[in-house]
Amino acid sequence: MGLEQPNNAAVEATSSTTSKLVFIRSRADYASFPCNDEAAVLADPTAAILVIGNEILSGKVADENARYLIGELRRLGVSLRRIEVIPDVVGEIAARVRALADTVDHLFTSGGVGPTHDDVTLEAVGEAFGMPIARNAELEGLLRNGYGPRLQERDLRMADIPVGARLEHGPGALGATWPVVVVRNVWVLPGVPSIFRRKFEAVRELFRAPPIHGRALYSRAGEGEIAGALDETVAQFAAAGVEVGSYPHLDAADYRVKITIDGRDPAAVDRALAFLAERLGDAVAKTE
């Protein structure tokens, strides 16, 4: 099918889950993209993760969801900009949701969506955007069908969501039975790791973007000795969107520093690696 590209700023790509993905370079064009059979995807999307729960901050429960999502977003081509962990306090959650949602394209929350007294995330997200909370008929029906005679009134709290939120089913298997609540660009996910993963997997293809390419160089010289070459590489390739990371490895047998070079343009990444390797000379232990 045909497609009119907003301001000639879109790039088409095919996907196994949609008839066509359209990568949008301009966020203004992304916001105004028409709703049709094509799926608009930002060419350079950013994300943040907000982990919510007193149990995480107290050390009673180890967070697994942020670590999982870091890897998934990387594989999808989404640049993660921030991770925060905050308590089950409505005002604090609302403030951080409001602030983070304004700085990234996708904000994922983890935790606080069950039927108990400390499950206040949806209330807080509603407060963040000035949206009242009301019972959603579709979610109530899913709860009644899922719980059957075991359903208690408090369980229906999980159907109380901000007015104006949308239910995103996604192409994955779980999406057909239990949707993800989305408020603007905030994706509200549960804290239980197994359910978090299943729900994200149902919608993960909605976030696919052009891949982030990565190379690595291992240096026999320490960071102090290679800092000048790193500075040169950063200055030379920053305009091409290349990011350089330097990570000492004190216990490695054959190198002292691992240097990563990442970017969306694979040719630029390769040029940056060659540029740095030339400056380090015999200090290069290996590249990959």
Regions found by a protein language model. Name each.
Residues E4-P6:
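Residue-level detector of structural "landmarks"
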Residues T14-S19, R25-S26:
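Low-acidity, Ser/Thr- and Arg-rich intrinsically disordered low-complexity segments
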Residues F33, V41-G91:
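ATP/NTP phosphate-donor binding region
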Residues I52-N54, T109-H117, G191, Y247, ...:
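Glycine-rich beta-strand-to-loop/alpha-helix junction loops that act as flexible
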Residues R67-E127:
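N-terminal small/polar loop signature for handling phosphorylated ligands or for N-terminal nucleophile
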Residues E92-A95, D119-A209:
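Proline/glycine-rich low-complexity loops and linkers
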Residues R184-R279:
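An accessory alpha-helical subdomain
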Residues L280-E288:
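Conserved short beta-strand edge segments in small beta-sheet-based binding/regulatory domains
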